[in-house]
Amino acid sequence: MPTPHNNAIKGDFAKTVLMPGDPLRAKFIAENFLTEPKLVKNVRGVQGYTGTYKGVPVSVMASGMGMPSIGIYSYELFTQYDVENIIRVGSAGAMRADLELGSVVAGQGACTNSNFADQYELGGSYAPICDFDLLMAAVESAKELGVKMPVGNLYSSDTFYDAAQRNMRYAKMGVMAVEMEAAALYCTAAYTGKRALAICSISDNLVNGTELSADERQTTFTNMMKIALEIAVKMDKK
């Protein structure tokens, strides 16, 4: 049934949903990567679409920015719309000098400065991790496509303008890149018994100050989307 944030009805969403942050990017993905996309959700400036890729139903819906936003949308998709897999497709800033611009990275885990997991009253810290089946499907798809995709830990920050010193402390612990959503998505998937994975394209490097041009960003975005869509095809067989 519809929620305060989603006016779709049960059955409108495929079992795999791709979630970029930007509503305009969700529209672009639907129109350029899916066959016969249909608008199924349009509330609060966030749209959701369902179409097919290689004959497999796939949905795409924006998450908005930050953990509270993706926490709401992913929880409703998992619990109200029978979605099984959510793949975050977004951008991230590299926190290591050796991580090349244009890389597509997969978040095996997501550390965070957020108190998002406090709602579960666990009495300690919780380590948000992705779903292993989704991660393996991503690794296999990247290899098949010939796309370099490092796998490791992401840093999901509650704040965009983080102090550089804090970022470097996370980098010293081997964290690959910073973004703003993965930890909440992984927590929500764990709590609801569903699957989630974040794959991100590296748009800039916080260590050396380099960044991709507009054309280069589009190329890495395409590689990320191809991987995500191939994951959906593989998961449809499970």
Where are each of the predicted segments found?
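Zn-dependent metallopeptidase/amidohydrolase metal-coordination segment
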Residues: A183-E216
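Generic non-transmembrane alpha-helical segments
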Residues: A137-L145, T188, I227-M235
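Active-site rim beta-loop-alpha module in soluble metabolic enzymes
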Residues: S125-M173
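Glycine-rich beta-alpha junction loops
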Residues: P23, G93, Y155-T159, A184, ...
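His/Asp/Glu-rich mid-to-C-terminal helical/loop segments that flank catalytic regions of hydrolases
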Residues: L206-K238
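Metabolite-binding pocket within alpha/beta catalytic cores that recognizes anionic/polar moieties
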Residues: M1-P128, F132-M136
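Flexible, glycine/charged-enriched surface loops at secondary-structure junctions
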Residues: T35-N42, G146-G152, M235-K238
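Short acidic/polar active-site loop segments enriched in Thr and Asp
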Residues: V83-E84, M176, R195
